[in-house]
């Protein structure tokens, strides 16, 4: 098949080019140079521009913006609980850090636009690439689409945006990783691994080392033993569990003669000859077996159902407490598999503080799970089912909300449809975490909406920009790329430098909160992963979530702001 014949097929079926851009973009994004890769998003953008240049497929705007709206709603829904939690007094320092970093980045971008006279398209790509926020590219393109210009100019500006984004994105990610993991620790004179060890030691500190009612974190093991140790005769279950607190043993059932006791309470008494069902981590069971008695194979007891559940923390009085405080007297028989806040997995340490909207992945008996749900919030039922009415309705309300405008000195101001969908998504996610009656969207579905929504949008942008990219490169030449790279370096580093100074000297944030906070304020998950790798600990994730949620919103809104500034500066 000749290239002309292939081009004809692609023009008849433009979806071929769309999905091909995603496929080739994945492989382009995987190419590493000294352990640095472009990533799937930028790879797809580049692949889309190349395929667009070769085949010029016509991708409907409806498809592009529909997928982008789904992406924005998913981002807002995920970040909603953390965003509104950042408005609380204890989270204000982290919120202030995010605001300063993102606003400084915007100010630097405006300065670069004024200096180099970038048009609105280049300005949009400068912000989205330098601050590694692809959502800002979409919101800026939405603003460009609404500009009162001829179609040729709009097409050229639309091509300039992804070109500038791809040019500045590389340093936007790599530069921030180097700053946060190498430069900033040297300026602060700290060692990342030592900082992590100290934070872990503080989080693991307990007020009562003998307390048996603490979350277990190891793989669950169920065993049955005949009670033969006379010292344990007539002891309560609580005393038994306290005796073997180091092994985290929990008695979940007892056979006494022909009587089978399930959901045993802490005040129940043991007797010699009882068959006891214990749940624990494997090492704990093995250690206790030497004292308790002979292990027996009681299949009826061992069939005691242990269930897994995801419990969302919604009770106001529980928010702000540590895992140790929650566990004391309330976590008997529960095993904490993982703890999640938005897209981040938190350390399962006794000092980790929880917030409303956090998700506990627990294993335990039905009674223990039910008790935990009453104490913490609610169990996520129908975890594989998405409330499509809530999702679609949220997008509709967001678009309508974004269309609202007010006039300031004759200039129309508004969020735009992209900003409207994002804000409504934030509110929708927050409302569900508080009132989980309707609106459930499971985490896998959110990830799918976010990933597919963004990648399809980026592929469509690249395909549309491809035919105009050559003209943009021809007009700008090497000088344009040099200006973009230089401006990108300034915009990427301006915010983190300001954040480092503010966080260290004014907010007095410790490095364990400051460094991941800067990464979150620049919305760069890759930087958090680099921090965790160099620091050898997941504890850095705690300081990432609040700034990430706040800056996700702010930098997305910077898209139309930078377009408006570029238009104003060009007059």
UniProtKB/Swiss-Prot annotation:
> Example GO molecular function term?
monoatomic cation transmembrane transporter activity
Give the record's membrane topology. Answer: Multi-pass membrane protein
Kindly give the InterPro entries that the UniProt entry links to this protein: AAE_transporter (IPR050144), RCK_C (IPR006037), RCK_C_sf (IPR036721), YidE_YbjL (IPR006512)
Q: Name one Pfam family in it.
A: Asp-Al_Ex
Could you name the Gene Ontology cellular component terms for this entry? Answer: plasma membrane
Q: Which SUPFAM superfamilies match?
A: TrkA C-terminal domain-like
Localisation: Cell membrane
Keywords in UniProt for this one?
A: Cell membrane, Membrane, Transmembrane, Transmembrane helix, Transport
What's the family?
Answer: Belongs to the AAE transporter (TC 2.A.81) family.
What is the name attached to this protein's record?
A: Uncharacterized transporter BB1538
């Amino acid at each position: 098949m000749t290239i002309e014949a292939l081009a004809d097929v692609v023009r008849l079926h433009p979806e071929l080019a769309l999905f091909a851009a995603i496929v080739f973009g994945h492989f382009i994004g995987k190419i590493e140079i000294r352990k640095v890769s472009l990533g799937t998003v930028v790879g797809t953008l580049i692949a889309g521009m190349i395929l667009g240049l070769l085949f010029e497929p016509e991708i409907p705007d409806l498809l592009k913006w529909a997928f982008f709206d789904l992406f924005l709603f998913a981002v807002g829904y995920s970040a909603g609980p953390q965003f509104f939690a950042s408005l609380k007094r204890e989270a204000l320092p982290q919120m202030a850090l995010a605001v300063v970093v993102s606003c400084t980045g915007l100010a630097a971008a405006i300065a670069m636009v004024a200096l180099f006279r970038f048009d609105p398209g280049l300005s949009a790509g400068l912000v989205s690439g330098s601050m590694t926020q692809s959502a800002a590219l979409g919101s800026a393109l939405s603003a460009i689409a609404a500009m009162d210009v001829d179609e040729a100019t709009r097409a050229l500006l639309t091509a300039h945006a992804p070109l500038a984004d791809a040019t500045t994105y590389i340093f936007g990610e790599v530069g921030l990783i180097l700053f946060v993991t190498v430069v900033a620790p040297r300026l602060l004179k700290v060692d990342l691994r030592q900082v992590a060890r100290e934070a872990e030691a503080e989080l693991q500190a307990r007020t009562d080392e003998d307390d048996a009612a603490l979350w277990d974190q190891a793989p669950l093991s169920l065993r049955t033993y005949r009670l033969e140790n006379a010292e344990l005769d007539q002891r309560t279950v609580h005393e038994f569990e306290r005796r073997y607190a180091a092994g985290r043993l929990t008695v979940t059932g007892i056979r006494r003669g022909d009587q089978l006791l399930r959901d045993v309470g802490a005040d129940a008494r043991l007797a010699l000859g009882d068959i006891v069902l214990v749940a624990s981590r494997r090492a704990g069971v093995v250690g206790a077996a030497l004292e308790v008695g002979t292990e027996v194979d009681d299949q009826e007891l061992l069939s005691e159902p242990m269930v897994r559940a995801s419990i969302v923390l919604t009770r106001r009085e529980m928010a702000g407490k540590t895992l140790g405080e929650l566990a004391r007297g309330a976590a008997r028989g529960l095993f904490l598999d993982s703890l999640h806040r938005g897209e981040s997995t938190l350390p399962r340490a006794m000092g980790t503080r929880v917030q409303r909207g956090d998700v506990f992945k627990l294993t335990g008996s039905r009674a223990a799970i039910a008790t935990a749900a009453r104490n913490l919030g609610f169990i996520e039922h129908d975890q594989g089912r998405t409330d499509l009415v809530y999702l679609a309705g949220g997008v509709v309300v967001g678009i309508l909300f974004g269309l609202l405008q007010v006039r300031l000195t004759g200039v129309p101001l508004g969020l735009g449809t992209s900003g409207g969908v994002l804000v409504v998504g934030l509110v929708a996610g927050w409302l569900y975490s508080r009132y989980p009656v309707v609106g459930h969207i499971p985490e896998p579905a959110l990830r799918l909406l976010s990933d597919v929504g963004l990648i399809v949008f980026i592929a469509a942008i690249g395909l549309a920009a491809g035919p105009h990219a050559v003209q943009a490169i021809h007009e700008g030449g090497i000088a344009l790329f040099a200006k973009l790279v230089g401006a990108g370096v300034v915009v990427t580093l301006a915010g983190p430098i300001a954040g480092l100074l503010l966080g260290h000297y004014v907010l007095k944030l410790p490095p364990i909160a400051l460094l991941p906070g800067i990464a979150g304020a620049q919305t760069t998950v890759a930087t958090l992963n680099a921090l965790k790798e160099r620091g050898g600990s997941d504890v850095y994730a705690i300081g990432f979530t609040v700034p990430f949620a706040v800056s996700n919103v702010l930098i997305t809104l910077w898209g139309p702001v930078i377009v408006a500034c570029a238009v104003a500066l060009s007059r």
